[in-house]
Amino acid sequence: MSDVCAVVLAAGEGRRLRPLTDRTPKALCPVGNVPLLDMALDRLASLGLTGPDTVAVNAWYLADQVVAAVRGRAHVSVESGPAPLGTAGGLGALRDWIDGRPVLVTNVDAYLAGGRLAPLLEDWDGDGTRLLVAAGPPAEFSGRRFAGCSALPWRRVRQLPAEPTDLVRTVWRPAEAAGELTLVDYDGVYLDTGTAESYLAANLHAAAAAPGGRLIGPGATVTGRVNHAVIGAGATVAGRVERAVVWPGAIVRPDEQLVDAVRYDAGGTVTAALNEGAPE
């Protein structure tokens, strides 16, 4: 469809990721040395959805950082209330911008790799509701789980109030009850990066294709032992880093061992032991 618009939901606090998100919004947490927001905008661009007339991003927590990071690539809806508006309320606040168009909605914390997003929109008439789904728990929809993207018709979006509400109860379940919900299987790897464990798993999956599973950003200084890790731009690694992430500019001292963890500043560390079922 030529008139589809897109919304990146990026207003959340990222509470499950704290302390990683104490000073950095979830949307700007890097996966494979790329901020989640940039990943979301790139996957929309792969569908031909670009620019502030076609793509919107909502923001609430540390909104000034999100606005600065968008850099004019999308329309920004800044929510100013005491709490974020949620997945449905965020769309309600964008009704005037959406203005009658069907909308592709993607969560900023969705990590999608190695698969195609295009089937979500293929042969879509813009009237039904579609969910991208993947195998694995929690089995929310016919034994599958939501995979971070949905395609919604205007007739359902126009009813959404600009108040804290979620899409599960206001759109998806009503569409399911009406027999209007279509599930589209994602043929790649999907992770919800909202926890430290899944955030680490996404990073290591992104690094797996690099030599030795080492993804090292520009300007990083690495004199220590690094295996299966992501090292951010300008980071300094003198100790041992294994199955771990070192954020841009962060430091790992010679006497340190960073294993199954995220180093998010000079000394701040979050441990995140991986589950056996984490993708490789």
PLM region descriptions:
Residues 5, 52-55, 128-130, 153, ...:
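Residues at the starts of beta-strands that form the adenosine-phosphate
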Residues 213-224, 229-231, 235-246, 250-252, ...:
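A structural motif detector for beta-strand N-caps
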Residues 1-8, 16, 30-108, 112-117, ...:
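Conserved N-terminal catalytic core of the sugar/cofactor nucleotidyltransferase
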Residues 28, 76-78, 129-132, 181-183:
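Conserved beta-strand scaffold positions in the cores of enzyme catalytic domains, especially
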Residues 103-104, 111-126, 136-207:
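Catalytic-core segments of class I nucleotidyltransferases/pyrophosphorylases
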Residues 22-27:
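Short alpha-helical oligomerization interface
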